[in-house]
Amino acid sequence: VEVCPTGALTDLKPFSLQEREEALLPCRAACPAELDIPAYLRAIADADPDLALSIIYEKAPFPGVLGMVCNHPCEEACRRGELDQPVAVCNLKRFASENGAPPEIQPQFPPTGKKVAVIGAGPAGLTAAFYLNSYGHDVTIFESEEKPGGMLRYGIPEYRLSRPVLDADISRLLRGIELRTRTALGKDFQLAELLNGGFDSVFLSTGAAHSKKLTIQGADSAGVYWGVDFLRELSKGNRPSLGNRVVVIGGGNVAFDAALSALRLGAKEVTLVCLEAEAEMPAFEKEITHAREEGVKIMNSWGPKAIESQQAAVTGVILKKCTGVFDEEGKFRPSYDESTLERVDADNIILAIGQEPDQGVVFGAGMPSAGKSGFFKVKGTGTDIEKVFAGGDAVRGPASVIRAISDGMRAAREIDGFLGGKGRLDASGRETSVVAGPGPEHGTMSPKIGRDEKFSERARTALGCLDPEERKKSFSPIESGYSAEQARTEASRCLQCQLRFQIQGVALPPEKWLVLDKKALEGVPPKEGVYQLADEKKITTRIAGTQNLLQALAGELEKESAGYFQFEEDPMYTKRESELLQKYLQKY
């Protein structure tokens, strides 16, 4: 990092603190959970995975999960990508979670006596519960399924997210929290019962774990599955018997997960059909790459017209050409060329066209207001029912895991504030840490930078990956993590933009001329002294002594005789006036 030592070269324009962070630390600014990415990368480069994991835990209680399934918006923003490829931030997070010693989780505040109910044990709900518990509140989670995790457990296959990793993260964050499983809102209890039963606040994190339905001919035929439901049953150990030919309809992550799962269940041919063109598919790039490697055929810009069947069993699907996905206003409104059709043989169809909340729960008695699609309406995270907050997919729709964690953290802050706390702020106004050990400065890290002659040549380190044919035989994780040497090498590719962020602007000499206006005159005393006036070019036009500086300058302001002024108190103002006049004459 090099800066001008004289301060003659400065930023073209002044930055606010937030603007400076976004401009100079793009990775951290892009992370919804506000992870201190440069800090934990530096710790890994210094061979300290324990510290790296501790830093991650400060903002995200799911290090193992995020190391495997985060969509890493930080990498999209990484400045190293402008040189060659972004730093593999997600892979390094995985290394820290697999090799670092989990830090001791410490309560931030003593018990408050307040009770909070969290409905839904997905990533948003679990995160909110974790932080609310650390703030000293008594937290109870209500979960309709047998186990916690939400879409992490029931929507992401094991080959992408190892269940031991998921279980380890959840078990750590649940310490001190009561979990009630197989307890469904609207069926086993009502919202009003919680509000009237001693809970001081309720957080709705009920998710969007239901498949959107498609009303086309044959959708009710035997052999037709719905994407999220298909993955949920698979995660529960209920493996459906599929035929040799499977067609998946959809272009998102659920569709690709269904396609790869179908291969692992024995399907010989899997075709994925989506409305979007190849560059527009919403699924993560890695998912698309893995699908192509495993032999999934992708048909872009096609949509389903009808499902064909014989004796109520699927035989194929008729497709129509999609000419556009969004209208001129950017709204989802597909258009088709009905004259261009194609038929694909199939023994099974998996419809994965989107997700939505459980409409029966959302629009049940005594629930907060929601839009037509079933997503709760909120201001911040607060709903239109006092004490009730909502967040995660139940508000924004299906989103990433890191976004759900961010929503849960925000909800915890707002609920804590509602209950009389101060959120994550300590007495100094700085966010407190939920882990024992290094504080926000992470001062144990090496400050040494030095010169690395091969720095620019260092290529991104890829994760180990099973052979495509081998990985289709089981639901074992596709990728393996870094070795210690690989992790240090990859972490050392970081440009360390945080160093530039920590260099504050050079203090310039104070401006001697003040703008002649009412605000500036508020700082002028009604005392004896000398003042000078200047024009718009800051050339002196008047030097005068006075018994009352404030009164004299107020008069000059009324006359609009100058644009700038300066003053100095001096009881011997006539003498000082003469001195200044002499200096002026000598200069000009």
Where are these regions (language model features)?
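Ferredoxin-like iron-sulfur electron-transfer modules
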Residues: V1, L9-A30, L51-H72, P102-I119, ...
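FAD-site-proximal beta/loop scaffold in flavoenzymes
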Residues: D220-G243, I307, D327-P398, I402, ...
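Feature captures the FAD/FMN-dependent oxidoreductase FAD-binding
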Residues: L51, P110-P111, K115-I119, D167-I216, ...
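A conserved FAD-binding loop/helix module that cradles the flavin
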Residues: A394-L425
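Beta1-alpha1 glycine-rich phosphate/pyrophosphate-binding loop at the start
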Residues: E34-I44, L53-S54, A60, E82, ...
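GIY-YIG nuclease catalytic motif and its immediate N-terminal context
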Residues: G505-G555, E568-L581
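Iron-sulfur cluster-binding cysteine motifs and their immediate structural context
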Residues: V1-S16, P26-D46, G67-A96, T140, ...
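Glycine-rich dinucleotide-binding loop and its adjacent helix/turn
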Residues: F95-F109, S171-K187, S211-L265, S369-I385
